[in-house]
Regions:
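Charged, non-catalytic interaction/linker regions at domain boundaries
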Residues: 2-201, 205-210, 316-347
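Amphipathic, oligomerization/interface secondary-structure segments
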Residues: 2-18, 180-347
């Protein structure tokens, strides 16, 4: 048997007996029976492309297998419908690699007594069927990816993050906040925005948050990155400057010798928004007052005082409106300021 497969087999049985006192040395010949085709595939045909841990004990992975790409998700996502995905059969080589690569622990069914009765039945045992092992681990579901994966590693990870955002939107078992349908639609929309400058990890964390204020803060961080850029954009347009963006920024920093003021730059940022996005937020009438409200809310959460306790009693409808407003603004603003992001990547 190939050394790689021997090591994988050993690691699988170590996982299976993780919460028991079973000594694997007492079963020196035990191994999972694999067909010749599956054996060869485990040995050479399965490649982990990218992985992402999200939520509690939730793992998403993309594998390349025999020239195709497959997405593996926990079983609760079995019913999701995403255009780029199609349901795939359970491919044993991918299942085998997925369990071991991600060190997925067995379920409570893998008690010592059960394993001794049905798996480790005799010290001389040699082969155990894959089905008799796999059933003691959490179930997962598999999809074939019909889209071509990006070449860039960061873009591959963002591709997976966007799939996870859309998957969570379609399966509310992981959601802890009462998002309304409009808000979930906004999350789905941002998952469809192919912009590798957008911090999709913040978007995914906000979707999985257990409190509205943490959901909001993660989305605010997506806007926060753009504040200085909005300041440069407004200055450039006001002064009708022909300087290249990076030269203008350096000249501004040198001339004013000061860091930007977030409250002012939040107003500059929101002045870029179109009316249909501004209309989502009914807490204030003008872009500047909307910016002031969002910035003040951020400060009240980050620098929480007893006088800010009313944040804890804000209604779900109000939070849905705020979250949806910020969500809808993110892809628009990142697209609007994309040249500044390219020219000033460290700002």
């Amino acid at each position: 048997m190939n050394r790689k497969v021997i090591d994988l087999q050993s690691n699988l049985f170590k996982l299976l007996t993780l919460r028991t006192s079973i000594q694997l040395e007492s079963f020196p010949h035990i191994k999972v029976f694999l067909s010749e085709e599956d054996y060869d595939s485990v040995r050479r045909d399965v490649t982990l492309v990218v992985q992402l841990r999200f939520g509690r004990d939730q793992i998403a992975c993309i594998y390349e297998y025999v020239g195709e790409n497959y997405l593996v998700l926990p079983s609760e996502f079995e019913e999701i419908k995403i255009p780029s995905l199609e349901a795939a059969p359970d491919l044993v080589p991918i299942q085998f690699i997925h369990l071991i690569t991600n060190q997925i622990e067995p379920t409570d069914k893998a008690s010592e007594g059960v394993l001794l009765e049905y798996v480790f039945v005799d010290p001389a045992i040699e082969f155990v069927q894959w089905e008799d092992i796999h059933k003691y681990f959490p179930l997962f579901t598999m999809f074939k990816i019909n889209d071509t994966l990006p070449e860039d590693e960061k873009e591959k990870l963002n591709f997976l993050k966007r799939l996870c955002i859309e998957s969570v939107c379609q399966n509310n078992s992981l959601l802890q906040l009462p998002f309304d349908n409009d808000t979930l639609t906004s999350y789905s929309s941002i998952a469809s925005s192919i912009d590798n400058n957008i911090p999709y990890d913040n978007v995914l964390r906000s979707l999985l948050s257990y409190h509205w204020k943490f959901c909001f803060i993660d989305l605010y961080r997506c806007q926060e990155r753009l504040l200085m850029l909005a300041w440069v954009d407004e200055f450039k347009n006001t002064m009708n400057s022909s300087l290249p963006i990076n030269e203008l920024y350096n000249a501004m920093k040198s001339r004013y010798n000061t860091e930007h003021h977030e409250d002012e730059n939040m107003r500059s940022l929101y002045r870029l928004l179109p009316q249909n996005i501004l209309d989502i937020m009914t807490k204030a009438s003008r872009p500047d007052t909307k910016a002031n409200y969002i910035y003040k809310l951020r400060n009240r959460i980050v620098h929480f005082q007893h006088s800010d306790a009313d944040i804890e009693t804000m209604k779900d409808d109000e939070w849905n409106m705020i979250v949806r407003f910020v969500l809808e603004s993110i892809p628009y603003l990142y697209n609007k300021l994309q040249n500044y992001i390219i020219e000033l990547p460290e700002v």
